[in-house]
């Protein structure tokens, strides 16, 4: 029996070791970059398509991380999502330029009033005010990348989770005619803002029904706002998921094929 347990333990360790090595390899595909303007810097990681050719044009994806991955190490933002875009299979099927920016610890992607004394947290999203510093830099960086000849401007995409889902909704409000499609996981926003992009941007919204960090009602209200303003959103509400509904979202077999199938006219 001891021998069987030992063999089983070794197999588990080998599988875990292989999985960790694969994740490390996928993260290594993302080069460390810095967007610098005046005295401000936005760290980001950049993955180019396999056999990148600057004379060709490629779709571009912006992925916005959650609050837990904020910082200045230019690494933590790859914890969630990098394996989805960096897998060998998806790089073959969906060649794209993928950008993972990192929001500093003391900032937020979206302009949000956050009260963490409640569970789920209380959130309010004022409209028509200046963007946060990180959002401003992100907007500027987006504008700069959009001028590059190897970026297909008809195939710009954005997505994010938690705080990044909130940032996704705000980015769509600020740039309603820019993105070909978007996805927001366990996020939140101001339903009134959906009027700007409901009819122009296909979106897939995800949330866990048991989310005790960001109330799933927040996504329901955003979807309702999109519907009322003429949009046709996809909505996946996972009955058993808590806040980590990104695991289920990333496992959706149609997510990337749906995302990249959309083109901006």
Question: Predicted regions span which residues?
Answer:
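A domain-start/cap signature at the N-terminus of enzymes
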Residues: 21-60, 68, 96, 133-140, ...
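C-terminal catalytic histidine-bearing segment of alpha/beta-hydrolase fold enzymes
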Residues: 185, 193, 202-265
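Alpha-helical scaffolding within the catalytic cores
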Residues: 79-89, 186-196, 217, 221
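The conserved beta1-alpha1 loop
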Residues: 64-65, 207
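Bacterial Sec-dependent N-terminal signal peptides
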Residues: 1-27
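Gly/Ser-rich "nucleophile elbow"/oxyanion-hole loop immediately N-terminal to the catalytic nucleophile
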Residues: 51-56, 110-161
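Active-site machinery of serine-nucleophile hydrolases
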Residues: 69-135
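Primarily recognizes the serine-hydrolase "nucleophile elbow" in alpha/beta-hydrolase
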Residues: 143-197
């Amino acid at each position: 029996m001891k021998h069987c347990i030992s063999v089983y333990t070794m197999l588990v360790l080998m599988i875990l070791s292989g999985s960790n090595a694969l994740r490390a390899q996928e993260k290594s595909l993302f080069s460390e970059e810095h967007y610098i303007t005046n005295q401000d810097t936005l760290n980001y990681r950049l993955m180019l398509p396999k056999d990148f050719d600057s004379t060709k044009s490629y779709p571009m994806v912006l992925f916005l991380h959650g609050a837990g991955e904020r910082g200045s190490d230019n690494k933590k933002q790859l914890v969630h999502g990098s394996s989805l875009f960096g897998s060998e299979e998806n790089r073959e099927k969906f060649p794209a330029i993928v950008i993972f920016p990192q929001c500093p610890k003391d900032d937020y992607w979206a302009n949000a009033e956050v009260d963490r004394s409640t569970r789920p947290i209380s959130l309010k999203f004022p409209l028509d005010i200046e963007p946060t510093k990180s959002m401003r830099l992100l907007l500027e960086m987006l504008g700069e990348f959009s001028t590059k000849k190897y970026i297909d401007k008809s195939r710009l995409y954005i997505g994010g989770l938690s705080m990044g889902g909130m940032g996704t909704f705000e980015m769509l409000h600020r740039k309603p005619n820019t993105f070909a499609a978007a996805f927001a996981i366990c996020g939140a926003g101001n339903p009134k803002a959906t009027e700007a992009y409901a009819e122009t941007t296909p979106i897939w919204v995800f949330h866990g029904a048991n989310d005790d960090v960001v109330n799933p009602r927040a996504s329901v209200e955003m979807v309702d706002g999109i519907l009322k303003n003429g949009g046709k959103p996809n909505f996946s509400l996972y009955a058993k998921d808590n806040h980590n509904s990104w695991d289920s979202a990333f496992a959706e077999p149609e997510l990337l094929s749906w995302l990249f199938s959309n083109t901006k006219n």
